[in-house]
Amino acid sequence: MARQRAAFGSVPRMNPLPKFQLKLWGTRGGLPVSGPQFQKFGGNTICMEMRCGEHVIMFDAGSGALSAGHALAAEGCKELTLYFTHSHYDHIGGLPFFKPLYCGQSSLKLWSGHMGSAMTTRQMLSEFMRKPFFPIGPDYCSAGIDARDFTAGDVLTPYPGVTIRTGMLNHPGNAVGYRVEFGGRSIAIITDTEHEPGTLDPAVLRLIDKVDLFVYDATFLDEEMATFKGFGHSTWQQAVRLAQAAGAKQVGFIHHSFNRTDAELTKIERAAKRQFPGAFCGRDFQVIEV
């Protein structure tokens, strides 16, 4: 059958790109905070939800996982994949309260790649959810849980058309950075990494090369780095330098210090935008589409 021609003067309908977005459920590092001085940017620890078309991919499960889990359960989400950057408390503390774990019809794949041969993802989950630290273990969860492991540097394909590139970051106990490619676009997750002043980490540059969006560990300020050397974190100024060097389109600052107030983060965001217009401070519940 011949393709119908568009009417004279009309514009042929283009197929829209599939949805590719990142939702920030938690943007703090260290521990959750609350109070009037934290209302604009929020106080939940790291948890992110990515939509690649119909597929749901989570990154980390800090305290933001509580709200994320309730929203996904209400939506009727039955299948998702969760990748851990690492297993410090502010990145896994919300996992036992993640509602899809307790939905019998749900299927979850949990992945980690920062521990090498020291511990598997399954062992990490079992060690975290056990007495005397927690009243129940993973066996109480009624969802189907498939715990898997990878090695930093591996390229993963969790769903058709979705490619995830991984790389090791500079953090005590290790952490993994991710670059997700879907529909000709890319988003990178770079949290919990310490830079050496005056240098740009080649592993980070590879993950963020010409990326549409990356979120980055901005716990400290450049002038604070000497005081906190060895803590495993970076700065918003380094994020801007990386974005400029890599040809990135947008960079979002995450892993805000639990001491950083709304007024301070607003000041940081304004200063960053003067240097790189695509920079912003991430906020709890913010959605960014690429």
Language-model region placement:
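Active-site flanking residues adjacent to catalytic metal/cofactor-binding acidic residues
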Residues: 59, 85, 190-191, 216-218, ...
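Cap/insert and terminal regions of metallo-dependent hydrolase folds
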Residues: 186, 196-284
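Generic low-polarity alpha-helical segments
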Residues: 1-11, 236-243
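Binuclear metal-dependent hydrolase catalytic cores
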Residues: 3-188, 199, 204, 266-290
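Short strand-loop junctions, especially beta-strand C-caps/beta-turns
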Residues: 113, 192, 256-257
